[in-house]
Amino acid sequence: MDLPGPIHEILVLFLGFVLLLGGLGVVLLTNPIYSAFSLGLVLVCISLFYFLLNSYFVAVAQLLIYVGAINVLIIFAVMFVNGSEWSKDKNSWTIGDGFTSLVCITIVFSLMTTIPDTSWYGILWTTRSNQIVEQGLINNVQQIGIHLATDFYLPFELISIILLVSLIGAITMARQ
């Protein structure tokens, strides 16, 4: 969407705030149904970010795939689980939980301080991709591949790590 600057900034700040609240809801709510609905809110906010960035296809794909399929599947699976199992486990924090929280907070703060100080445009891969694209000897599919392997390398790797962690979590939950 081509919005005026102040309106665009207000929408980005509002969506970011709702995204943070939804993320906290996913983590902090003890009822898994409420947590799944918070995840749906987070995924809808991400889709709205894509709309603001004029990437309509990715926004609709985000809504259809993640909100429409995966989140509904999560809610469906949670409803099959016996509700009394969730309320029985009222353990307080253990040493392992505290250690894991400390490690996660340390990683988040180190990334928050490292990423803004890195000059991503000075990386050799991005200059190579511009030279290859300027030659015009490749088609659109190859250009997408080059951009995924060069310009969008960091987001692509972060998404793969998130998918790996979710796969490990799903396997762990299935074994129990």
From Swiss-Prot:
A single cellular component GO annotation: chloroplast thylakoid membrane
Superkingdom per UniProt: Eukaryota
Primary location recorded for the protein, binned into one broad class: plastid
Record flagged with keyword Transmembrane: yes
Membrane topology: Multi-pass membrane protein
Enzyme Commission (EC) number: 7.1.1.-
Family membership: Belongs to the complex I subunit 6 family.
Name this protein carries in UniProt: NAD(P)H-quinone oxidoreductase subunit 6, chloroplastic
Organism: Brachypodium distachyon (Purple false brome)
Gene name per UniProt: ndhG
